[in-house]
């Protein structure tokens, strides 16, 4: 927790303050309860957080965390394989290039028919977004490793899994984390949409339910919660990056 607090640095505080200033200017310009003031929203957010809001945020966080875990378990080995094997790259990369640009959200109805209306369909949707970023990032990271480094490591007596742990994984880790960082924003947006179908838990459901009830203060409290969830995940990635890739900060 102390490490997390240290990473919420002055730049993060500056960003939050600037968003609040722009939000307040928009609030006083429109002069409508459609956009409540930051103060009112934060006050309502704090009141809701110990109960209903935490429940919805945890449901959304669980879906994203499960999708990230599945994507890494599948995407990293596959990315390493096609990065190291030219034949595998020639066979799989064209398929990836065809599927990667497709809007994954369009497949949600298909996932719901095949997997049911529960969490499985929503998690699968997020996996299809994240896994391509991971696969391509790992593959490209492996390809960028100079052959001379493989020779140097081999001359030191390192072989097999040692090459992966001492050379390949450290080389691809910055790209992998960057890919995760990019895909997280898209994933949260897609999850917001997915949680409006056949579910009663999740921050996306909470926001849209508040909108249908014309409760704009609750709606913006949910939007604030969604933003803070994204901030938490991205800050966690920054912490992991500093731990696993300290050389890029020298």
List where the protein language model places each region.
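Periplasmic/extracellular loop-to-transmembrane helix junction in inner-membrane transport proteins
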Residues: 3-6, 29-70
């Amino acid at each position: 927790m102390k490490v997390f607090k240290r990473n919420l640095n002055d730049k993060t505080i500056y960003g939050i303050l600037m968003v609040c200033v722009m939000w307040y200017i928009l609030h006083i310009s429109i002069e409508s309860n459609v956009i409540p003031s930051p103060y009112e929203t934060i006050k309502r957010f704090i009141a809701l957080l110990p109960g209903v809001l935490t429940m919805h945020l945890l449901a959304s966080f669980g879906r994203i965390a499960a999708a990230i875990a599945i994507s890494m378990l599948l995407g990293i080995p596959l990315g390493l394989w096609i990065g190291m094997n030219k034949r595998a790259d020639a066979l799989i990369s064209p398929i990836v290039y065809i599927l990667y640009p497709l809007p994954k959200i369009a497949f949600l109805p298909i996932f719901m028919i095949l997997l049911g209306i529960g969490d499985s369909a929503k998690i699968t949707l997020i996996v299809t977004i994240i896994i391509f970023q991971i696969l391509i990032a790992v593959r490209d990271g492996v390809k960028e490793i100079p052959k001379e480094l493989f020779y140097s490591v081999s001359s030191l007596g390192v072989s097999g899994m040692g090459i992966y742990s001492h050379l390949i994984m450290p080389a691809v880790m910055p790209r992998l984390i960057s890919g995760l960082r990019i895909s997280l924003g898209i994933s949260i947006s897609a999850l917001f949409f997915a949680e409006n179908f056949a579910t009663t838990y999740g921050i996306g459901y909470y926001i849209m339910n508040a909108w249908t009830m014309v409760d704009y203060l609750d709606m913006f409290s949910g939007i604030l919660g969604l933003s803070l969830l994204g901030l938490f995940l991205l800050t966690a990635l920054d912490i992991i990056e500093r731990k696993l890739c300290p050389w890029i900060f020298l």
